Swiss-Prot record:
Record flagged with keyword Nucleotide-binding: yes
Assembly behavior: The complex is composed of two ATP-binding proteins (PstB), two transmembrane proteins (PstC and PstA) and a solute-binding protein (PstS).
PANTHER family: ABC TRANSPORTER I FAMILY MEMBER 17 (PTHR43423:SF1)
Reactions that this protein is recorded to catalyse: phosphate(out) + ATP + H2O = ADP + 2 phosphate(in) + H(+)
Protein name: Phosphate import ATP-binding protein PstB
GO cellular component assignments: plasma membrane
GO molecular function, one term: ATP binding
Taxonomic placement: Archaea, Thermoproteota, Thermoprotei, Desulfurococcales, Desulfurococcaceae
Annotated organism of origin: Aeropyrum pernix (strain ATCC 700893 / DSM 11879 / JCM 9820 / NBRC 100138 / K1)
Assigned protein family: Belongs to the ABC transporter superfamily. Phosphate importer (TC 3.A.1.7) family.
Taxonomy, superkingdom: Archaea
Length: 253
């Protein structure tokens, strides 16, 4: 099992002439969950899109500073190599609509040659669906299509698809923002279990302090593109040092 950390140093991002991220630095370790927390428009989603080079797809984006995944310089590495080790789950569920539940989870391992035969592929699919807390709900309907699932189930299917490749770095952009409370709890459980059991580096964007407090080991609090506070979750939540952090935790900003 290869352990991979994420290190960000002096990161600045502009989109056309707008300065989105301003001097961001932090480190995320294997076996931990890092929550990037802050109000809408603080640059949270932009930050994780730099880590897996999705920033390249945004017209007018310019990046300065350093981002490392282990010994890979993210901004100089081939994006394909970066994405071999990183998984991504977005805010909106995005399973492949014309593939079955089984095919959605199996497609990644098949393309990357992770299974020698059908039995091994079946085992990967079952493991990923169990890790996403979806297996018990779909094990007898693997040939169904995503439109036959609820929104929360579709999001857990998106998570299972990402987990099937066992990414060493898992990035999640507000994955529970638009789903039901039951699926939210299950996805939060999956995130923590995956980080701990697979010693993966997990980074989740959230605008909800309560979610950050429940699942993360450390919090990076962003406000208007700057790091306001960064540290262990319990310490930051119980003893915030900055007035803006106190206000955000109290629902005032």
């Amino acid at each position: 099992m290869k352990l991979m950390d994420v290190r960000v140093s002096g990161l600045n991002v502009w989109i056309t002439d707008k300065h989105i991220l301003k001097g961001i630095s932090f480190k995320a370790q294997p076996g931990t969950v890092t929550a990037i927390m802050g109000p809408s428009g603080s640059g949270k989603s932009t930050l994780i899109r730099v880590i897996n080079r999705l920033i390249d797809l945004i017209p007018g984006a310019r990046v300065e500073g350093e981002v490392w995944i282990n010994n890979m310089n993210v901004m100089k590495e081939d994006p394909y190599n970066i994405r071999r080790y990183t998984g991504m789950v977005f805010q909106e569920p995005n399973p492949f609509p014309h593939m079955t539940i089984y095919e959605n989870v199996a497609i990644g391992p098949k393309l990357h040659g992770l299974a020698k035969n059908k039995k091994e592929l079946d085992e990967i699919v079952e493991w990923a669906l169990k890790m996403a807390h979806l297996w018990d709900e779909v094990k007898d309907r693997l040939s169904d299509y995503p439109h036959q699932l609820s929104g929360g189930q579709r999001q857990r299917l998106s998570l299972a698809r990402a987990l099937a490749l066992k990414p060493r770095v898992l990035l999640l952009d507000e994955p529970t923002a638009n789903i039901d409370p039951v699926s939210t709890v299950k996805i939060e459980q999956s995130i923590v279990e995956y980080a701990k059991e697979e010693m993966a580096t997990v980074i989740i964007v959230t605008h909800t302090p309560q979610q950050a407090a429940r699942i993360s080991d450390q919090i990076l609090f962003l406000y208007e593109g700057r790091v306001i506070e960064y540290g262990p979750t319990k310490e930051l939540v119980l003893r915030p040092r900055h007035e803006l952090t106190k206000k955000f935790l109290g629902g005032e900003v």
